[in-house]
Amino acid sequence: MSIPLLEYKPSSQNQRVPGYEVPNEDTPRIYRIEDAAYDSELKELIWATYRQVFSEHVILKFFRQGNLESQLKNRAISVRDFVRGLAKSEAFKTLVIKSNSNYRLVELALKRLLGRAPYNKDEEIAWSIKIATNGWDGFVDALLDSEEYQSNFGENIVPYQRRRYKDRPFNLVTPRYGNYWRDKLESERYIEGDIKNFLELAKSIEIKTVTFTPVSTANIKIPDTTRNTTPTGIPISVNPSANFPVR
């Protein structure tokens, strides 16, 4: 039996109140699959979903999910199921899950899947317990099946940062991994020019003593290079235009 989600009190955020801002260049573009009438528009929607879920401006071909893309193009799955598949993919687990703690995974998931930051530490603790009990896949299902996701994005809208006002976009202020993983990578990296590396290298060198083997010249057998026969004929020089007599 899984532990129910702990209660937490939502804090005041922009997306919780209605807005009357005039649309400008900072207003997020909303991608709906109903608006993707052409193949180019569908590709833009797919790329927008990758950018939202992975928060990467460049997606390697190795990390792309061709099976999910094909199902979405054929309308076999909804945008919500496409987002669900990307969040549960091995590529996402390799890039994000393996390099973050549960608390930070909650922050990243709320920003990328629900389009908002965590309300407070209590919400981070509550969702981190959900990850510990139901696993990452269960946590993703809980977010995408929630009333908050359904009421804001439904089945066919790509998630986006809701009501961003003056703040910078989440992808610019929330890198793929935190300070802990960065420091871990730095400690494991070979630092060129560090004197400690030279000292460790010098200590690791094992000097082998050279042993000399005495050799007596009397024991060296010189091969006999004399000939038993006398050469006959006229020797020809290397230069065919000249020759020399035989005495």
From Swiss-Prot:
It is found in: Cellular thylakoid membrane. Residues 223-247 are annotated as: Disordered. Transmembrane segments: none annotated. It comes from the Bacteria. InterPro entries: PBS_linker_dom (IPR001297), PBS_linker_sf (IPR038255), Phycobilisome (IPR016470). It holds the Pfam family PBS_linker_poly. PROSITE patterns: PBS_LINKER. GO terms for cellular component: phycobilisome; plasma membrane-derived thylakoid membrane. One of its GO terms (biological process) is photosynthesis. It is a peripheral membrane protein. Residues 11-189 form the PBS-linker domain. Keywords: Antenna complex, Membrane, Photosynthesis, Phycobilisome, Thylakoid. Belongs to the phycobilisome linker protein family. Part of the phycobilisome, a hemidiscoidal structure that is composed of two distinct substructures: a core complex and a number of rods radiating from the core. Rod-core linker protein required for attachment of phycocyanin to allophycocyanin in cores of phycobilisomes. This is Phycobilisome rod-core linker polypeptide CpcG2.
